[in-house]
Amino acid sequence: MNLMLYHYYDSLFIAFFIIQSIVFVTWICFLIYSIKLIKNVPKLSSSKKSRKNSCSYMVSIILPARNEEKYIRKCLDSLVKQEYSNYEIVVINDCSSDNTSHIIKEYVNKTNCKIISIDTKPRPPAWTGKNWACYQGYLHSHGDLFLFTDADTTHSPSTLSLAVNYLLSENLDSLTAIPKILSNDFLTRITLPILWTFSLARYSALKANDPKTKMGYFFGSFFIIKRNVYEMVGTHKSVKEEIVEDGELGRKVKENGFSLKVIHGENLISAIWARDSSSLWHGLRRLLIPLYKKEIVKTTILVALTFILLLFPFIVLPFSTLTVINGKLGISDLTFLLFTIMSIILLILSSVLQLKYTLFENPLYSLAFPLASSFLFIAFVSSIISSGKKNTIEWSDRKY
């Protein structure tokens, strides 16, 4: 019996050692790649040489809004103060039940800036709400360029002029800026660094910026695109059923051979991705459920990797500690413990890096990594379990 237990313990140790070694190497790669992204992804700033006559291009800012009374004033305040001289703001009230419509009308009446206000009719069955609103905005626009943004996003006065100048100077068809993501609650602050790091595996800005790849995406809070390009990829009508429409539209731009660039805009643009813990939960489901329905095997592997990379080191820490205390396996047990501890340190360092340089939050939030990892894994598993049901995604007071 003792011999059988020893062989079982030995086999378990070898399996755990191999998995932990892979986790250790993976987090080294994540950390190195995160540093590379921070350093090498371009930044939207005034350092780029200004292009003459850039203001000759009319820009239509398309702003869909549904029940945004808490945020839309700040957004509109920032948009009407843009230094760029040739633009209009097309605001679409997407069947709001709060004071959003009233606030929009206030700005139409009190500002000198050209604001076009639209009240959408109820969306057709095949459309998601935001796509329908954006499409209605396009139909009422007059611009050569479109800037799509969200009602909970704010922009520095120079944002539009810098973005247009960058687009034209680089001879791009489209441009999207990474905003400063604002967090309103503790759970969002501890979860976003991990989510941001994990997103590197699928949504690498360096890969999106490589014209040789077909991978592309937009940040819904800020992307600018030429009118003819938007029309040639099919407008929002081509992604009318998509829940994560900004990612799909960006992918279509690259797949159709048009240029796209992802740049840092945190110094100029602020956005709220999750307004509280409830919207964080629904936001994660909004990301994963559509992905699971399209790529079942890949998404299942992703969830399994979430467990292995985030939770496995904490789970095996007691086991690796016991191997050192028992001292039955020689130097390998010490190596196992070292890999486990170093993996946890790398997890925390990756979180610190995102908190400090991407999310601009207190790095001490990284100490809550185990709680955040557990929350993410539960949200992902819940999404897979619910994916076969109807009305499982709740977003902007609608169910899909």
Model-based region annotation:
Residues 57-60, 88:
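Cell-envelope/extracellular polymer assembly enzymes that use nucleotide-activated donors
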Residues 99, 151-166:
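Acidic donor-binding/catalytic loop of UDP-sugar-dependent glycosyltransferases
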